[in-house]
Amino acid sequence: MGFFSGEYDCTVDAKGRMVLPARIKSNLPDIDAGNVVLTRGFESCIVLYSQTEFKKIYSKVSGLNEFSEEYRVFQRNFFRGINEVELDSNGRLLIPKMLMAHAQLEKDITVVGMGNRVEIWSPDLYQKFLIQDSSEFAQLAEKYLAPTKKE
């Protein structure tokens, strides 16, 4: 699995296509052969997964109890908006209109490597979801990254 990192300013053309940044593209597993999965993010963004990474998530979702009403509601919303997309010879991918609307994308976009996935944002919305206060960021780092007694 590739490790996606970095923050990139990109554009979407009139047909809804974007060029995947070279650094992101180079980290896609060869086994996926230029095919990626786009889905709605929990926030107002689009999430891009390699097919290899998405299969791991799919396995978790498909292993849940289908007889649970709560699970079925989750599953319905999870699968809503998932699109398998192929990169063309120029490294472009077509963003479906429904996902463009979900993320409120226009011409300018921000692409953010997030380790095992990539987020695609409207630049203005992206800024709203960033922490502006360094002490708040430090508190979250302490909460989630500080060693536990087991370590």
Curated annotation (Swiss-Prot):
It is found in: Cytoplasm, Nucleoid. One of its GO terms (cellular component) is cytoplasm. SUPFAM superfamilies: AbrB/MazE/MraZ-like. InterPro entries: MraZ (IPR003444), MraZ_C (IPR035644), MraZ_dom (IPR020603), MraZ_N (IPR035642), MraZ_sf (IPR038619), SpoVT-AbrB_dom (IPR007159), SpoVT-AbrB_sf (IPR037914). Keywords: Cytoplasm, DNA-binding, Repeat, Transcription, Transcription regulation. GO terms for biological process: negative regulation of DNA-templated transcription initiation. Residues 7-53, 82-125 form the SpoVT-AbrB domain. GO terms for molecular function: DNA-binding transcription factor activity; transcription cis-regulatory region binding. Its main location: cytoplasm. CDD domains: MraZ_C, MraZ_N. Coiled coil: none annotated. It holds the Pfam family MraZ. Forms oligomers. Belongs to the MraZ family. This is Transcriptional regulator MraZ.
